[in-house]
Amino acid sequence: MDPAASSCMRSLQPPAPVWGCLRNPHSEGNGASGLPHYPPTPFSFHXXPDFPATATAAYPDFSASCLAATPHSLPQEEHIFTEQHPAFPQSPNWHFPVSXARRRPNSGPAGGSKEMGTSSLGLVDTTGGPGEDYGVLGSTANXXEKKSSRRRKESSDNQENRGKPEGSSKARKERTAFTKEQLRELEAEFAHHNYLTRLRRYEIAVNLDLSERQVKVWFQNRRMKWKRVKGGQPVSPNGQDPEDGDSTASPSSE
């Protein structure tokens, strides 16, 4: 071990540490005014690390006791010194009240949190713009889809409406396919009577395996054809007017 360090360990009262000189620039003035230095703590309370000889050689002004002093003991020593010497001038930048010391560290994060909150709100506001744009685009897309679906429905309805008259016209244009025997019997009956009674129409329909409506429609068409061929409104073969004959022969046929 270095002889300087060993002598420091043996001495019970080492010289005043340099921390007071460093902390107080008016150390010389204090000596002149008669204020004694605060009592140093014995070296036995602190650990004795082995310092190389180069440290003492490089810093001859520093004693071994100053090098051996640990930082965690400094606040206690300062507290003891301030209690023993209350008249010693203290700088406001060095010591703060406990309440102010507790509030100041919290004020920073609080202000930071407020700033963070405002910044986060700003971020939300700034990011809200694209979200609104996307919402507008989505609404326009939905409106376009609805319009297209409506157009499709309207077109389908129009096609159905167009198809319905065609179907009805086709149904109307459907004609009964009469056989040769049926046509022969109908022509023979028309040669005798242009208008049929209801009972005679029923008999012909049963004999020819037709409906009364089919027989009635055939006679109507046959009369129109006969009128076109002869021209004008002819007299019935029986010498009766067609209106009168139809009304007298079959009052309930129509």
Swiss-Prot record:
Keywords: Activator, Cytoplasm, Developmental protein, DNA-binding, Homeobox, Nucleus, Repressor, Transcription, Transcription regulation. Pfam families: Homeodomain. SUPFAM superfamilies: Homeodomain-like. GO terms for cellular component: cytoplasm; nucleus. GO terms for biological process: hematopoietic stem cell differentiation; positive regulation of transcription by RNA polymerase II; regulation of transcription by RNA polymerase II; sclerotome development; somite development. GO terms for molecular function: DNA-binding transcription factor activity; DNA-binding transcription factor activity, RNA polymerase II-specific; RNA polymerase II cis-regulatory region sequence-specific DNA binding; sequence-specific DNA binding. It is found in: Nucleus; Cytoplasm. Its main location: nucleus. InterPro entries: HD, HD_metazoa, Homeobox_CS, Homeodomain-like_sf, MOX-1/MOX-2. SMART domains: HOX (SM00389). Disulfide bonds: none annotated. Residues 154-178 have a biased composition (Basic and acidic residues). Residues 171-230 bind DNA. The keyword Membrane does not apply. Gene3D superfamilies: Homeodomain-like. Residues 86-178, 226-254 are annotated as: Disordered. Mesodermal transcription factor that plays a key role in somitogenesis and is specifically required for sclerotome development. Required for maintenance of the sclerotome polarity and formation of the cranio-cervical joints. Binds specifically to the promoter of target genes and regulates their expression. Activates expression of NKX3-2 in the sclerotome. Activates expression of CDKN1A and CDKN2A in endothelial cells, acting as a regulator of vascular cell proliferation. While it activates CDKN1A in a DNA-dependent manner, it activates CDKN2A in a DNA-independent manner. This is Homeobox protein MOX-1. It comes from Pan troglodytes.
